[in-house]
């Protein structure tokens, strides 16, 4: 009986912690295979995707709050559907930014490929998002996406009553910096992501760009992605 109670408490904790951002399928897999879940933090190679809407502050000041949040939530719904489809897991919404990880909590050897394909699908979906915006007399919006593959420390932050699954580390910060270099409608990925993403990734013929992100000691080579397979931006 004590074992059954402990298992129920554990399941409740996992559902509270992960249920807000993992798909039902992934959540059930975690509950059925506790070896896939490392509570307390672990280092793992993952691919991190961060997206951000351009000029959102100006939009929020021009639009009434109800309309702005309705527009934002519709955008989130569209993006979440795509991220889930490509086996990504959303860790946070920071304002209008989406922070997603591929390869955690479930390992995924194709995390770089999935994240890059996901980003292309997200940018392609923006046409439909803006068609809906215009039908509601909302302004068109655009976003930039940064992707990097590297090591992060992942685990639960908080307590048994209130916890959040999150990631920290240099490579998480670098992904945010990469996103900051993107222009509207652009996808920039690191050398590490491009090398691991596979041959279906289509890079801009203009070639890579060398940048020095703030807070990063070394120069970083970034690649402008314009498609995945036959799906072009």
Model segments located where?
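Cytosolic regulatory/linker segments at or just downstream of nucleotide-handling modules
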Residues: 152, 181-233
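Regulatory cytosolic signal-relay segments
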Residues: 1-44, 202
